[in-house]
């Protein structure tokens, strides 16, 4: 987001925080003198604050020693957390957690191999049941601040790899019973949004949900296909694809410290020290996720060779 900002930002006053009026005037001045209508629109998009979201930018060192930047956004009103980063190979990963519906969406935008006949990129989405204890709440996330934003972070705990075998496609135009965020986030993955039967059954236990409405939003994979894409020679044959991604750093829990508070007895003649617990930090984790799912052509899974 910030890469387009400098040309607009140079027209802002160098000292102090500009008001919304000053921001509008600065962008208008830029538009008037450069006749750059697109830049005028971009200025407004970049400089209009969103008071409902809180964002952290985290520098994370991956296992290969490379540093990537994660963007973690918390929306308390929607009870959402969105984590996004770009891998060194250009793959863009977006993780959205919908706490209200206990849904986690992982979206992967993978750059295509044009020399092998692929389009510029392809998008896949995986919707799974989210366990609330796996990530701190949106409210707690919104309260986090960095003392040293340029520090390179490494997680305290490696949670290893979790494997998911997907069983159905999601029909995005019917996906509201799962979460309303699927259709917007995964709009480019119309034929490549996946879910598991076991998660449908778990969501059906939530208040206001039903297995019939959830199943109506999905289409099962063809039966009796067990051939992995790395075992198939034809680029046009169906197969089971595997995609793995790792979240290198995320807040997976809160830390509590013990303190002492002074309290009185009922008579008020004695005071005693009592142990109390208070929040004093976060626990950070790393986790990899491997998805196995059906593709209609091996051409859609060239990385799994």
Curated annotation (Swiss-Prot):
InterPro entries, per database record: Oaf (IPR026315), Oaf_C (IPR053897), OAF_N (IPR053894)
Keywords noted in UniProt: Developmental protein
Pfam families per record: OAF_C (PF22873), OAF_N (PF14941)
Domain of life: Eukaryota
Family as reported in the entry's similarity comment: Belongs to the OAF family.
Role description: Vital for proper neuronal development and hatching.
Protein name: Out at first protein
Organism: Drosophila virilis (Fruit fly)
The organism's taxonomic lineage, starting at the top: Eukaryota, Metazoa, Ecdysozoa, Arthropoda, Hexapoda
